[in-house]
């Protein structure tokens, strides 16, 4: 299901990029990986602060071996929004996931 959703986001992003590109409007998306936050804290951390089994599985599938930090998402958004650094970037989905989407598990 995740693959289908990711492909849907890519298709929509690319369609919007083509549709609005002639007007000078860029359309890009960010595909975040796993970030520890208040809403998922109990799923990822035990009462003593150690990782749950679920968190260990996520970390094992993330080549960088950790959860993302909010400022890493902010950096990606600022890059994509910048007319100086990304004025010719259009129609992409930028993974900010520590390599999770690239990892095959071997």
Specify the residue positions occupied by each region the protein language model found.
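Residues in well-ordered alpha-helical elements
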Residues: 10, 38, 71-74
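Short, flexible, glycine-rich and Lys/Arg-enriched loop motifs at helix boundaries
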Residues: 104-106
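Rossmann-like NAD(H)/NADP(H) cofactor-binding core
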Residues: 23, 28, 92
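Active-site helix of classical SDR
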Residues: 5-6, 13
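Catalytic Tyr-x(3-8)-Lys segment
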Residues: 50-72
């Amino acid at each position: 299901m995740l693959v289908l959703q990711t492909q849907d986001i890519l298709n929509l992003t690319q369609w919007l990029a083509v549709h609005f590109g002639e007007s000078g409007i860029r359309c890009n998306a960010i595909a975040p990986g796993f970030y520890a936050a208040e809403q998922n804290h109990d799923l990822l951390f035990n009462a003593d602060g150690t990782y749950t089994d679920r968190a260990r599985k996520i970390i094992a599938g993330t080549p960088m071996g950790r959860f993302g930090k909010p400022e890493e998402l902010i950096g990606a958004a600022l890059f994509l929004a910048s007319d100086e650094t990304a004025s010719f970037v259009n129609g992409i989905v930028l993974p900010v996931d520590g390599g999770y989407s690239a990892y095959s598990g071997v």
